[in-house]
Amino acid sequence: MCIRDSCYGIIIYMFFLRILEKLGRKRVVMDRGLSHPEYNLAKPWTDRYYLLFRKRPKWFPFNIFINHIKDNDHGIGLHNHPFPYITIILSGGYWETNIKKERKWRGKFYIGFRSADNLHRVDLEPGIKPITIYIAGPYGLRKKGRSEYGTWK
């Protein structure tokens, strides 16, 4: 039985995610892609729930989804994204490390705006599985190349 009002919010939220899953809007994202040299070691990294497009057309300027992050970024390296993005942490939090090796805690209600060229990594505290709203911006704005696996460049 829920004692606090927040319990009802969690129940409604979990029900909403189940509906998205039943509608085919859930995808398990692995911690490394098919092009990674050690793809055979891939494991689930986040559960992604698509609020707009399951497969966004490249011409459409944005997409919105919920990420339920399950594990740290793999390896020791940084990564970037093919588009600028906004992330809003709804619950939990994570450590974000940047190219300067600055490590900052990003907690509940944190809002981050990032360019497509931003290099970073995400690490979790034990027992914390953050949930974020992620707004992916338009493709084609990354000026640098894709990040290299296992590096800080």
Regions found by a protein language model. Give the residues of each.
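Conserved short histidine dyad/triad with adjacent acidic residue
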Residues: 65-80, 116
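Active-site or metal-binding loop neighborhoods of secreted/extracellular toxin and effector enzymes
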Residues: 140-153
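Short, conserved beta-strand element in jelly-roll/cupin
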Residues: 81-95
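Short, small-residue-biased leader/transition segments that mark boundaries at the very start
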Residues: 1-3
